[in-house]
Amino acid sequence: MGRGGKRTWYNGDRREAKRNRPNSIYNGEGRPENLVVGEKKPKRKVACLVGYCGSGYHGMQLNPPSKTIEGDLFDAFVKAGAVSSYNADDPKKVALARAARTDKGVHAAGNVISLKLIMEDEKLIEKVNEHLPPSIRLWDVIRTINSFNPRTYCESRIYEYMVPTYAFVPPKPSSILGNCIMKNSPMPAEPINKENINQLSRSLFYEEGKEFWDDYDIAAKEILSLYEQDPEGFVNPYSKRGAAALANSENNKGSEAGVSAKTNPDMDSDSSAIVNEFLKPDSVEDESAGSKIDPSYRLERALKHIEVLKLKNYRISADRLSVIRETLNQYVGVHNFHNFTVGQAFHQKNSNRVIRSFTASDPFMIGDTEWISCKVHGQSFMLHQIRKMIALAILVVRTGCPVERIQDAFKKTKINIPKGPGFGLLLESPFFKGYNEHKAPENNRDPIDFTKYEQKITAFKHAHIYDKIFLEEARKQVFHCFLSFIDSYNEEDFSYLSDIGITEKTQEVSSKLPDVLSSDEEEDSAENKDDLEG
């Protein structure tokens, strides 16, 4: 038997193995049993404009058996008849590709995937959307040139990151980080020159921080006084049981139970609902009144309630907003972002990235919490880069650190930068300027553009992305937990935020420590991390 015969036997064996292997592209489920094998129909290369909420998904790209956005999309294409039964077992057969491979939990108002679809049905978009959950939408299907690949033709991307303004409140003076800053970063001499952004930022750290935490201390002392009077009988006035006691106290003048309304001015019904959702252990306390719960635990929860409510009532000043904007502006340009991802060395060429703009919106209210929207426009991003950029900006602003510390992070010294919470990040839109201006018109193809779907996309963002972000923050106080962890972490690890700056010792400390707040997302994919964004 010659080489040809050997090759025939080998290929046949491979085909048999391929037929028999289990199919797992349908987000961990088997291939739909109702697929009917029919005649082969012509396919066309297209760009699909999509939007999605990433909550509950293990990222954008197919990764069997994990649940992914592309898994749901491909399943919908098959069920709508846009992918034939011959190709339903393997997305590679239809050349599936994407513009941005968003990370676990990251959302997208606009993203682009390309593949070869059967385009016979005029109602294809409607049919595909019928097979998708409301949190994933197909905006349009656009014919492209045959060589189109959204990743290589995508010239830049805009990401949006939602931040509650209380994230910029200075750390508590008694915390490890707060003490480190006060010990190593003195208040600038009077008078403060507000045109000097670093003097302004440092003065805000001391003045605004003192005002905020002094106000907290007053409320906390009243709670401590109640606790000291009767530790065993102490009831958290911010729990459901405590609120009932407060109402009873107000109805029965002269009663000593509970606290006065003046002691608890922030306890409106909405705040109570949100806080009780966040601090669910207190509902256990209500069910076992008089019980086995340690009184010191009740005190701890009461003090936490006060802190949460004070943070929710924080409103950002114009001066602090100007510091935020100047801090974000430090990222603009071509810089080495080896400190803003994982497994990347300073000398590697692909550590350099282009940031075209980084802006912060005016503050806006959602419920009783104030937010700002930060938008970064860049050529491409590495794994966790945006979340680390946001986290460092927050730390620089809230500690009164010189804004140039951002520039220091682009240098060779390795420093430890934590990842900001992932749920607040969304891909706004990828851009295909070169393709739209040259390749598309030259080949009689429509441009790839999201602008004509702006109203639909805005409505989708509010219904399925923003609301999820705001609700998760209201329920879990994610940013508060994140910053509380940072504030209580090893002093040496974040001493670079003080006037000590980045030194050789900073690198020694960082090299000995794992990435702060690392999670299963950190190891999501060591390979192709250059393609994994957020």
UniProtKB/Swiss-Prot annotation:
Modified residues (Phosphoserine): 518-519, 525
Name of the protein in question: tRNA pseudouridine synthase 1
GO molecular function: metal ion binding; pseudouridine synthase activity; RNA binding; snRNA pseudouridine synthase activity; tRNA pseudouridine synthase activity
Gene it is expressed from: pus1
Subcellular location: Nucleus
Family per record: Belongs to the tRNA pseudouridine synthase TruA family.
Nucleus listed as a keyword: yes
Enzyme class: isomerase
InterPro entries with a match to the protein in the record: PsdUridine_synth_cat_dom_sf, PsdUridine_synth_TruA, PsdUridine_synth_TruA_a/b_dom, PsdUridine_synth_TruA_C, PUS1/PUS2-like, TruA/RsuA/RluB/E/F_N
Major site of localization recorded for this protein: nucleus
GO biological process, one term: snRNA pseudouridine synthesis
Reactions accelerated catalytically: a uridine in tRNA = a pseudouridine in tRNA; uridine in snRNA = pseudouridine in snRNA; a uridine in mRNA = a pseudouridine in mRNA
Sequence segments annotated as region (Disordered): 1-32, 246-271, 507-534
Lineage: Eukaryota, Fungi, Dikarya, Ascomycota, Taphrinomycotina
Documented EC number(s): 5.4.99.-
Active-site residue numbers: 103
A Pfam family hit: PseudoU_synth_1
Cellular component GO terms held in the UniProt record: nucleus
Role according to the record: Formation of pseudouridine at positions 27 and 28 in the anticodon stem and loop of transfer RNAs; at positions 34 and 36 of intron-containing precursor tRNA(Ile) and at position 35 in the intron-containing tRNA(Tyr). Catalyzes pseudouridylation at position 44 in U2 snRNA. Also catalyzes pseudouridylation of mRNAs.
Keyword annotations: Isomerase, Metal-binding, mRNA processing, Nucleus, Phosphoprotein, tRNA processing, Zinc
Cofactor needs: Zn(2+)
